[in-house]
Swiss-Prot record:
Source taxon at top rank: Bacteria
Pfam families on file: ATP-synt
Listed name of the protein: ATP synthase gamma chain
Any GO CC annotation of this UniProt entry: proton-transporting ATP synthase complex
InterPro entries for the chain: ATP_synth_F1_ATPase_gsu, ATP_synth_F1_gsu
Species in which this protein is naturally found: Bifidobacterium longum subsp. infantis (strain ATCC 15697 / DSM 20088 / JCM 1222 / NCTC 11817 / S12)
Family: Belongs to the ATPase gamma chain family.
SUPFAM superfamilies for the chain: ATP synthase (F1-ATPase), gamma subunit
Keyword Membrane: yes
Location in or out of the cell: Cell membrane
Record has Cell membrane as a keyword: yes
GO molecular function, one term: ATP binding
Known role: Produces ATP from ADP in the presence of a proton gradient across the membrane. The gamma chain is believed to be important in regulating ATPase activity and the flow of protons through the CF(0) complex.
Record's subunit section: F-type ATPases have 2 components, CF(1) - the catalytic core - and CF(0) - the membrane proton channel. CF(1) has five subunits: alpha(3), beta(3), gamma(1), delta(1), epsilon(1). CF(0) has three main subunits: a, b and c.
Amino acid sequence: MGSQLALKSRIHSTESLAKIFNAQEMIASSHIAKARDVALNAKPYSDAIFDAVQALVAHTHITHPIAVKDENNPRVAVLALTSDRGMAGPYTSSIIRETESLLSRLDAAGKQPELFVYGRRGSTYYKYRNRDIAATWEGNTDQPGVEIAETISDTLMDAYMKPAEKGGVSELYIVYTEFINMVVQKVRVLRMLPVEIVQNETKVPSPDEAAPSTADIAPLYTFEPSLEKVLDAILPKYIQSRIHECLLTAAASETASRQNAMHTATDNARNLIDDLTRKLNASRQASITQELTEIIGSADALTKKEE
């Protein structure tokens, strides 16, 4: 009887958890379409800014901080984009794992990484382990706005433009999760500054192939009023657009990861309920069989006694 009560209690608690998991899955499902569309809509603007920066760096000989790293400054900024809430599967743990790997590689290279964290789960993880954190931001990791992107970009810009003797950094890295589709989300490490030139693979076309289109050729720009002023103006826009794009694709990844995790948790809870129900029924059947056996045995004993 006691085992049956324990099984009933476990079934009841598991049913309650299944309802919570299913509700979380439905909420994530209602948010994922918007999160995906917002991330995709932000990409063209970010790509256009990046193309302009690429043109600045590739077609001019400049010594601006946007393109030239201070080799004498070993300090490096690393921004990790985690989540505020749990129940998102391996989302935050994957970011932390990749961040730790990046920090180890930077340490091995003689760098001095400074950690910046976005998301309550990440900041809690590092604070619990007494790790030094330069700055943290929390709130709405699954629905980030332009304001938080501006705040983060301003902080990182100040750190990057600050002289080395005043604690400035020579490189900016961001660790985030890129949304590929509902099933696949990949952790990426992006070096935002100094800007790296992305070389498109080119080949000599054969006689039967068409010549490369103008879309494959880097555009030419005229910089007014001057190259230096254009660089100063475009640098904060570049940082903000890249961070905003990373925040949005990370938010879509978090929502997709949460939906997948809650779907799996709901299925596991239902499977556990079925398993516990079978055990409960088997226990009931055994109890009934035992009672019937005792009744029959008692009846036989009484019959023999009367004879």
